[in-house]
Curated annotation (Swiss-Prot):
This is Gamma-glutamyl hydrolase. GO terms for cellular component: extracellular space; plant-type cell wall; vacuole. It catalyses: (6S)-5,6,7,8-tetrahydrofolyl-(gamma-L-Glu)(n) + (n-1) H2O = (6S)-5,6,7,8-tetrahydrofolate + (n-1) L-glutamate. Keywords: Cell wall, Glycoprotein, Hydrolase, Secreted, Signal. The keyword Hydrolase applies. GO terms for molecular function: gamma-glutamyl-peptidase activity; omega peptidase activity. It is an enzyme of class 3 (hydrolase). InterPro entries: Class_I_gatase-like, Pept_C26_g-glut_hydrolase, Peptidase_C26.
Length: 342
């Protein structure tokens, strides 16, 4: 019995000691925010020369993007939501540049953005071409005035920029490249500082040369020979990459401005990540998505170099957030979502 008393006493003493110890340790338990003195926390300073809230203007295209299934309104235009998502994935916001609004309104919106994107589509003449040409001219003027104002043009947008620079309406040639997944033949200039492909990881560049990671979806383009022998084009552009069509004919798939931050892509990176129509053959592999992201990162990194910092409220009043996207992909063709401007 005495032994039992001793054991009981020993047990309670041990338990009491443990409780005291636990209480003592509780005094030293900290939240993550309490681990450092606020004065001791420091972050690498951001580059004061860069604009970390860039805004991109995207030019709308005539129609509803769905052959009239979504809207037959006179003068309706659209932006495929995939272009908006592409820009946002790079860290920028979007202001729609409505192609048939007044020049005064367009100019006001251009004063709010740090770069422009020309989309794919079908319109090759009329008011749309006139507006695109005027915006392109103003973009070059912005650069001449000292602002770094990038332009990126996909598919039809790229072809129209080529036509505008060449000052020839018949400069383009027919190619069989509709809904064509493709690899790229990278030229030496692709390694140049400030080029699109310089932003790509080295392993992804290797994949681009062998795997079909980009989607071409056009019927016209320009051959390398024709671009190089046209003085206006060769003075303005250098070729970064070429591709072959279904007949084995080679066309320029990527080119960039020698003097200006202008990039022309005949392939459409936004479709890899954001378009799912069964009629397309867009690659959706992980590496194809990396191509989308790397292209977006490049373009928005260029836009951050723009010194234009407009009034924040004017920007907010013009953002595409003021509009709602419409689902147009129920038929499994065309764009999954579009923004309509009526």
């Amino acid at each position: 019995m005495p032994n039992d008393s001793v054991l009981s006493l020993f047990f309670f003493v041990t338990l009491f000691t443990c409780l005291l110890s636990a209480t003592s340790h509780d005094d030293h338990i900290f939240l993550p925010s309490q681990l450092h003195d606020d004065d001791s926390v420091s972050c690498t300073a951001t580059d004061p020369s860069l604009n970390y809230k860039p805004v991109i203007g995207i030019l709308t295209h005539p129609g509803d993007g769905a052959s009239g299934r979504l809207s037959n309104a006179t003068g309706v235009s659209y932006i495929a939501a995939s272009y908006v998502k592409f820009v946002e994935s790079g860290g920028a916001r979007v202001i729609p540049l409505i192609y048939n609004e007044s020049p005064e309104n367009l100019n006001k919106k251009l004063d709010l953005v740090n770069g422009v994107l020309f989309t794919g589509g079908w319109a090759v003449s009329g008011p749309y071409l006139d507006t695109l040409g005027n915006i392109f001219k103003k973009a070059l003027e912005r650069n001449d005035a000292g602002d770094h104002f990038p332009v990126i043009a996909f598919n039809l947008g790229g072809n129209l920029v080529i036509r505008i620079v060449s000052e020839q309406t018949d400069i383009l040639e027919p190619f069989t490249a509709s809904s064509l997944p493709s690899s790229l033949v990278l030229w030496n200039e692709a390694n140049a500082k400030g080029s699109l492909f310089q932003r790509f990881p080295s392993d992804l560049l290797t994949q681009l040369k062998t795997d079909c990671l980009v989607l071409h979806n056009h019927r016209y383009a320009i051959s390398p020979r024709k671009l190089q022998y046209n003085t206006k084009l060769s003075d303005f552009f250098e070729i970064l990459a070429t591709s072959g069509d279904r007949d084995g004919k080679t066309f320029v798939s990527t080119a960039r401005g020698r003097k200006y931050p202008v990039t022309v892509n005949l392939w459409q990176p936004e479709k890899n990540a954001f378009e799912w129509a069964t009629s397309l053959k867009a690659p959706h592999t992980e590496d194809a998505i990396r191509v989308t992201q790397s292209t977006a990162n490049f373009f928005i990194s260029e836009a951050r170099k723009s010194t234009n910092t407009p009034d924040a409220q004017k920007v907010r009043d013009s953002l595409i957030y003021n509009y709602k996207p419409t689902f147009g992909g129920t038929a499994g063709k065309g764009y999954d979502q579009v923004y309509l401007f009526e």
